[in-house]
Amino acid sequence: MNAMKCLEILREIKDVAFATVDENGKSQIRIIDVMIVEKEKLYFCTARGKEFYQQLIHNGQVAVTAMNLAFQMIRLSGRAEKLSEQKKWIDRIFEENPSMNQVYPGDSRYVLEAFCIADGE
C-alpha cells in the first residue's frame, strides 16, 4: 500500500489517535479529526489555547494511528508544521468539513490553527 492510500484511509476514518510529546518529555494522546489529505500531506487543526497546540509548537513530533472497519491499521509518524496563510486553510477546512460550523460558528473558527504532516513515515 502506498503512502497516499494510507493517508486516504486515515481521512476516511477521520477520528484518529494523535500522540505528541509534552514539555516533560512524556507522551500525550488524544483523538483528532483528519481534515484534509492531499499531495501526500495530512492536514488537521486545533485551538491555540489547548495543550495539544503548545506541544505541537514546542516539539512538533507526532504519531497517528487508527483502524478502519476492515481491520486495516495505519500508523504515521513525523513532524507537524504550522501552515502559513492560516485564514485560507481554516476556511478550506470548514468548506470540506461543514460539521465544524456547528462547533465553531462564524468567526469563532479563527481560534483554530491549521497544521500538516508533510514528511511522515
Report each predicted region and the residues it spans.
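Charged, amphipathic alpha-helical segments
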Residues: 1-4, 49, 98
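A short, Trp-centered hydrophobic/proline-enriched beta-strand micro-motif
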Residues: 8-23, 62-66
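A generic structural signal for short beta-strands and their flanking turns/coil linkers
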Residues: 12-16, 30, 38-40, 58-62, ...
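Histidine- and/or cysteine-centered catalytic micro-motif in compact active-site loops
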Residues: 21-23, 47-49, 67-69, 77-81
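A generic structural motif
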Residues: 34-35, 87
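A short mixed-secondary-structure module that forms the rim of ligand-binding clefts
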Residues: 35-71
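Charged, gly/pro-rich active-site loop segments
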Residues: 75-121
